[in-house]
A protein has these predicted regions:
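Acidic, low-complexity intrinsically disordered tails
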Residues: 7, 26-31
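P-loop NTPase switch module centered on the Walker A-proximal segment
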Residues: 32-138, 142-144, 193
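N-terminal mitochondrial targeting presequence
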Residues: 1-2, 6-7
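P-loop NTPase catalytic nucleotide-binding module
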Residues: 31-53, 71-72, 139-307
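Short polybasic linear motifs
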Residues: 6, 13, 17, 21-22
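Intrinsic-disorder-associated, low-complexity terminal segments enriched in Asp/Asn/His/Tyr and depleted
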Residues: 11, 23-24, 33
Length: 307
């Protein structure tokens, strides 16, 4: 079952009443005020992952980045956009697949927040039928889980590409490296690191993007970021991962492979083209870093999806 969260001018989406929630938010972009988009300007994104990987929280951050809402809700406060029924409030988890939307970089993103439990896998199947790409979340403390395999199976069955997101990197026992190794061991799709965290754990506020070769640092838990040069003590690791990224992007297209052999590297646009081909063939899973709860990395993930 797919359920749409609708917005009406002047009213927030269905949720707890102001008395039940710690804050009352304003819906900034009701559907009636949207521009008309062509099919090429619309992306349907399916958020998948085992229970507790942070799909609903990431969906909330994406809506915030697109200025659909002026303040993020939380699972604990029972006021997220997608978990808005009494039973979801009671159990503190998604029961239904819910469709949200946001506008970002002159594109419309339809975001389908799917339940992680295999008890509700029918709604995941429905979501993938209409989705363009899966955003596959992993809890940085747990890595690949039993629930991850179930979600991956549906992506394979319906031949959908997936982008990997290591979420909750601000958790006490977050372990990015172990998470990546667990994905490599279990996934039939090769993970390729696009970002890695600088300081995972409770102090997590920065990651290095080896596609753009920049470091991004965040503050205030509101998505605001600084773009910085990569520190000297991280440069060797960043360059090594950039080389792996280039090689994996090149190997999926003969023209890119020839260009790589000729020049020894690829431009950022060439890398994106190679990753797009690898995604379409369902042979690559680009890996991104986020903390949905702190809105770290959300905007960069959305930029990649659009570009």
């Amino acid at each position: 079952m797919l359920r749409s969260t609708t917005f009406r001018s002047g009213n927030p989406a269905p949720r707890s009443t102001p008395d039940e929630a710690p804050h009352h938010r304003k819906t900034l972009k009701p559907y009636g005020n949207m521009k008309n988009y062509s099919a090429k300007e619309i992306k349907n994104i399916v958020l998948i992952g085992a229970p507790g990987t942070g799909k609903t929280t990431l969906a909330e951050a994406m809506a915030f980045e697109g200025k659909v809402i002026d303040r993020r809700g939380s699972i604990e406060a029972n006021n997220t956009l997608s978990d808005n029924t009494d039973i979801e409030h009671e159990y503190k988890r998604s029961i239904y697949s819910t469709i949200l939307f946001t506008e970002f970089m002159d594109r419309k993103l339809n975001i389908i927040d799917c339940p992680g439990s295999d008890d509700f896998c029918g709604s995941l199947f429905s979501a993938f039928k209409v989705g363009d790409v899966g955003v596959f979340l992993f809890n940085a403390q747990n890595g690949w889980e039993v629930g991850s395999e179930i979600q991956a199976r549906y992506a394979r069955l319906l031949k959908k590409p997936v982008i990997g997101v290591v979420n909750q990197l601000d958790a006490e026992k977050a372990n990015f490296e172990a998470t990546i190794e667990s994905i490599r061991a279990a996934s039939r799709v090769k993970p390729v690191i696009v970002q890695y965290p600088v300081n995972q754990g409770p102090e997590f506020n920065a990651f290095i993007d080896v596609l753009l070769m920049k470091m991004y640092r965040f503050k205030d838990n509101d998505g605001h970021r600084e773009e910085l040069e990569i520190p000297a003590d991280e440069m060797d690791k960043a360059q090594e991962l950039n080389k792996e990224l280039v090689e994996m992007a090149a190997e999926h297209d003969e023209a890119l492979m020839e260009l790589y052999f000729d020049k020894g590297t690829l431009t950022q646009d060439d890398i994106r083209a190679g990753l797009k081909i690898g995604l379409a063939k369902r042979e690559l899973m680009p890996i991104f870093c986020t903390s949905g709860k702190r809105d770290i990395g959300t905007k960069r993930l959305m930029e990649f999806i659009i570009n």
